Design a protein with these regions (language model features):
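Metal-dependent de-N-acetylase/amidase catalytic core
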Residues: 1-4, 84-242
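Active-site rim/loop-helix segments in enzyme catalytic domains that contact anionic ligands
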Residues: 1-98, 227, 233-239
């Protein structure tokens, strides 16, 4: 089975659905990762956008090696992702590249602009994935993938439709979150600190707290929640989640 995880930035997937991807890996799925931006403005200490993007892509590739994932970077500007013909074509291309049975992605209602726009772009092109008159670098799909949004901003009060118990892979997920080392100085700076080690602990706690909250909802120790994308004529297959 092919699984495509789509995120807006490096580190989105590690916080939101790394446990699920690890369980997909362990059952033998083919995993694909696509990012709409490379997070090239996500630092106050790295001097240029180009250097920041290169560092963050390298961190993401390190994580993807743990998933055994193939990776595609769409490289739109961080904090500048818009709904255009160009971005739609790029997202359509990424979906066809992976030929997925299952897509995990940002929810379109996420208040972070790049997060929400990434989810919106996925939903906007979904009915075109099989269309022969929608050109891309890869052939049209012969099946409609099942789409589930990971539970992004917990402040939105969304109750997931389904949970994946990630208790057995939680430590590996935590280590993957900590792979995004470039973000420690960014987090420290926005919190008015220069203590990168404190920021590292915050990153670790954020990963564990989010996962523990999902576990409390799912009646297990640690879990990730997902919301099914319902589209006229298609129902996602819940059994595809591990």
């Amino acid at each position: 089975m092919n699984v495509l995880a789509i995120g807006a930035h490096p580190d989105d997937l590690e916080f939101m659905c790394a446990g699920t991807l690890l369980k997909c890996r362990d059952r033998g799925d083919n995993i694909f990762v696509a990012l709409t931006t490379s997070g090239n403005t996500g630092s106050n200490t790295i001097p240029t956008k180009e250097e920041n993007a290169a560092i963050r892509e390298a961190e993401q590739l390190e994580c993807c090696r743990h998933y055994g994932a193939q990776t595609m970077f769409l490289r739109f500007d961080d904090e500048g992702l818009l709904d255009t013909a160009e971005t739609r074509r790029a997202v359509l291309n990424a979906i066809r590249w992976a030929d997925p049975d299952l897509i995990l992605c940002n929810p379109p209602w996420d208040p972070s602009p790049d997060h929400g726009m990434t989810g919106k772009l996925v939903t906007e092109v979904l009915l075109s994935v099989g269309g022969k008159l929608h050109p891309s670098d890869y052939p049209p799909l012969e099946k409609m993938p099942s789409v589930f949004f990971y539970n992004g901003d917990l402040s939105q009060g969304i109750v997931p439709d389904i949970f994946v118990d990630i208790t057995d892979v939680i430590e590996e997920k935590r280590q993957l979150c900590l792979t995004h080392r470039s973000q420690f100085s960014w987090i420290a700076d926005v919190r008015g600190s220069t203590d990168n080690e404190e920021a590292r602990r915050y990153f670790s706690e954020l990963c564990m707290t989010r996962s523990r909250f999902g576990g409390m909802q799912a009646d297990c120790m640690y879990a990730e929640g997902f919301i099914a994308h319902l589209i006229l004529g298609y129902a996602p297959n819940y059994k595809l989640l591990p």
